[in-house]
């Protein structure tokens, strides 16, 4: 009998929490933002978590998702820039590398290496995103070491 009452109380408490999350618009938005963050749609997650914080400034889930989305977007942008720079370097190297092109390549390498150092690492960030950013940096370090 006591066991049944304990189970009923536990289910009731879980239902209350679920009702709270479902009825509070700020937490509803925060849950959607968390879903988009986990789906690697960082811009949508950022927008939704910002809306959730606008509704309730004390929503910790939304604040965490907002901060993590900002960091993830910086990592994604770094990776995207790295790919674009590598494409430009490949195009430059197909026609022969002039002294000016050599300086541009060196500058691109320096920018990518320095930008990596400015990225804010977090334990909550996706490991795949962090490792891809690190490998992008390593490509530019290797390229710089081999060429200069």
Predicted regions and their residues:
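Alpha-helical tetratricopeptide repeat
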Residues: 23-37
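Alpha-helical linker/edge segments of TPR/alpha-solenoid repeat scaffolds
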Residues: 68-95, 140-148
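Canonical positions in the second alpha-helix
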Residues: 51-52
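Hydrophobic membrane-insertion alpha-helices, especially the h-region
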Residues: 4-22
């Amino acid at each position: 009998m006591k066991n049944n009452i304990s189970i009923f109380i536990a289910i009731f408490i879980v239902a209350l929490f679920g009702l709270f999350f479902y009825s509070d618009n700020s937490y509803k938005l925060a849950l959607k933002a968390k879903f988009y963050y986990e789906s690697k749609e960082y811009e949508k997650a950022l927008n939704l978590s910002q809306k959730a914080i606008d509704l309730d400034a004390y929503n910790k889930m939304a604040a965490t998702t907002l901060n993590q989305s900002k960091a993830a977007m910086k990592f994604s942008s770094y990776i995207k820039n790295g790919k674009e720079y590598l494409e430009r370097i490949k195009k430059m190297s197909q026609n022969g590398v002039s002294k000016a092109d050599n300086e541009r390549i060196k500058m691109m390498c320096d920018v990518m290496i320095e930008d990596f150092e400015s990225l804010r690492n977090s334990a909550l960030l996706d490991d795949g995103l962090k490792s891809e950013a690190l490998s992008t940096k390593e490509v530019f370090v290797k390229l710089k070491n081999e060429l200069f």
